[in-house]
């Protein structure tokens, strides 16, 4: 974990969180990172963070708050970059096997899923890749229970409506229903 409390670069872990940072994993903090924040006093809903060997997660700019019930997994040699200055509500799931970039001022509602891979499932199609980078630019709003799939590029200011599934290119300042 790379941070500096005196410079405001720290990691706050709340009760009922499981953190696994394997050998050579990196958690780089350029701002405060709050993990597993609870709104309901006494809740035991756990949050999980796994960064496998060679994986890297970086909070780039302003503070980032992840509410309880989160599951963030950064696989071997994968990169997860979060711009900061906002956060995610309860139930965030991020599965990163390649590269996921989330821009500044991007908010996630309840039960949002972001993934850049399909779980290593074998599909017999020439040229098929099991993962593809995801880019979510700044000032994006991912609303309740939406899913961002491998290869998605979401331009600035877009809003992804509740229970939408997104793949491919989403233009700036658009609303996906």
Residue ranges and their predicted role:
Residues 168:
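Short helix N-cap motif at coil->helix boundaries in the Bergerat
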């Amino acid at each position: 974990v790379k941070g500096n409390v005196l410079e405001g670069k720290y990691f706050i872990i709340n009760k009922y969180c499981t953190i696994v940072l394997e050998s050579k994993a990196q958690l780089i903090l350029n701002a405060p990172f709050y993990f597993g924040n609870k709104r309901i006093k006494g809740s035991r809903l756990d949050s999980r963070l796994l960064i496998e060997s060679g994986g890297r997660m970086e909070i780039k700019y302003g503070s980032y708050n992840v509410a309880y019930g989160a599951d963030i997994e950064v696989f071997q040699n994968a990169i997860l970059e979060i711009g900061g200055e906002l956060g995610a509500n309860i139930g965030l799931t991020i599965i990163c096997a390649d590269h996921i970039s989330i821009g500044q001022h991007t908010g996630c509602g309840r039960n949002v899923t972001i993934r850049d891979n399909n779980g290593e499932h074998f599909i017999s199609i020439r040229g098929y890749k099991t993962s593809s980078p995801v880019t979510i630019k700044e000032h994006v709003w991912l609303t309740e229970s939406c899913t961002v799939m491998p290869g998605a590029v979401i331009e600035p200011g877009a809003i992804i409506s509740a229970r939408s599934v997104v793949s491919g290119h989403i233009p700036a300042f658009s609303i996906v229903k």
